[in-house]
Amino acid sequence: YDSYNNLGLWLDKSCIQFFNSTVAPSILEFYPTVGVKRDVNSKPEASLYALRGLLSVRYTLVPKEKVEDWEKEKLEGWNLVSSTTSYLIYENENWVPMGFTYDSYITEENFETVSDTNAGNVLMKALLLTDEQVERYGQMMQNLTDDEKNNISYEDYVQDCTARRESAVTSFTATRTGFTAQADLEAENLVLFSVPYDDGFTATVNGVPAEVEKVDNGLM
């Protein structure tokens, strides 16, 4: 929070506050969708709390000289768990592991009616699919209703995070060339990874080649 760019590199951890001049083009599509300016620097505002669940953010590091500003944000769901000489470390009680499924999808036409500031909340409820993807995968999920789309309170967000967490992968390991994940699903479904989509990715499920889909305007 309001700290150095690329702090995650110092700690060998992934981080959503990041400066990098070589990024996957799809991230330039995704971030404006959810109300975040993106060029070579990503720095989502703390007020966009639902993005933290969607992007599997577990901790926020707050410089000690910025604690007063952090407290003024009055953000729910963050608990102080540790500290260093320079930082206070807060844990996200609504953290969702990297890689999870949905019970619902939302079409591009329906998603266009959602404001940028509420987009993160809606994307915790439903997977954004193109019309072609709805034809291919729509039978796996329900079409999000307008009533469900409009339920975007913090309490709704907590419930959505809980639901996504219950369907999350059991392990996720980043590698030099990509990542591996394990999941135990009751039925066939799409698994969202908040990784920028790129044509160079390939995937296998139980050793069988699988399609990698671009969803949520830039994730996969």
Language-model features: locations:
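Active-site regions of enzymes building and remodeling cell-envelope glycoconjugates
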Residues: 9-16, 72-83, 87
